[in-house]
Amino acid sequence: MVSVSEIRNAQRAEGPATTLAIGTANPTNCVEQSTYPDFYFKITNSEHKTELKEKFQRMCDKSMIKRRYMYLTEEILKENPSVCEIMAPSLDAWQDMVVVEVPRLGKEAAVKAIKEWGQPKSKITHLIVCTTSGVDMPGADYQLTKLLGLRPYVKRYMMYQQGCFAGGTVLRLAKDLAENNKGARVLVVCSEVTAVTFRGPSDTHLDSLVGQALFGDGAAALIVGSDPVPEIEKPIFEMVWTAQTIAPDSEGAIDGHLREAGLTFHLLKDVPGIVSKNINKALVEAFEPLGISDYNSIFWIAHPGGPAILDQVEQKLALKPEKMKATREVLSEYGNMSSACVLFILDEMRKKSAQDGLKTTGEGLEWGVLFGFGPGLTIETVVLRSVAI
């Protein structure tokens, strides 16, 4: 007679969850940040709002973003004039767009990840899909299963409207699935199309202007599994420990609400301060068991909600400027892609580490941290261990 504990032990993997492949994708429409204010105020028929345009120009100039990729083109916006108005009912128009585009962009990233992984897609046992927009039934997880031709009995998990911290959430969930289901191979897809946040400029909705200056569209996909098959699967990062916490006294710091006008965001000015004030506690909890207290000795992947957050974290922890190099590079080249950002940074870091001839996927270092920040204010923490190149 086999005991329950024996059954449980047989179900568990031996080693830690490991990233086995990464793929990314963006819409073809590339927007230069330097000229975006002119385009934005012209397409929304707001060129007469000169003071507001100057304010928006300053936001874009300070964003540290060079370019972004956006699903919304001039043609799409002209075909849907209601979405360019200030708080006009436009949710139906947005929904029709994003319920198609979120799975489509996600498929593009997933195909790249599966190709790098090099295994048949029939070996995918679990699917985690995350997006901030396009709530629908059946959801984007169902649509992706169909688009990719995955087995109909793949175990699906759909996460809607979590916001910018969710890049950490999907890794936490993938880790638990991979480590507690022997042989599991988890396809993780974060597909973010921020069109639903687009609207015309208004003096009374300055929060919305921040989003117009920062948000970009992109999708990232990972294959996660424990106990990589030697000579066949190539590990990139190990996920060693995860945590999620709500920062104290942070209610209302970042809120998002789905309205007839689309998804509206509300931000407190002190969001960078709240993040930096709580970051040390999260690091101590994560790295004290490893005997690490010098946070310049680890590699960094932080959600780039904006340059002010990165600046204050650097200042609070006395981090060397190069610690946030990969994070700032992704912010500069893609903008804030919500949950997909940290996965893009993982990809950027492993590629740059190889190009620079470093010894590990984590900039030559062994240990690292991944942070997601978002509504709540919620902080996701993932301790990563790099792999020798």
Curated annotation (Swiss-Prot):
Its EC number is 2.3.1.74. The keyword Oxidoreductase does not apply. Induction: By infection. Keywords: Acyltransferase, Flavonoid biosynthesis, Transferase. It is an enzyme of class 2 (transferase). The active site is at 164. One of its GO terms (molecular function) is naringenin-chalcone synthase activity. Belongs to the thiolase-like superfamily. Chalcone/stilbene synthases family. PANTHER family: CHALCONE SYNTHASE 7, HYDROXYMETHYLGLUTARYL-COA SYNTHASE. This is Chalcone synthase 4-2. The lineage of its organism: Eukaryota, Viridiplantae, Streptophyta, Embryophyta, Tracheophyta.
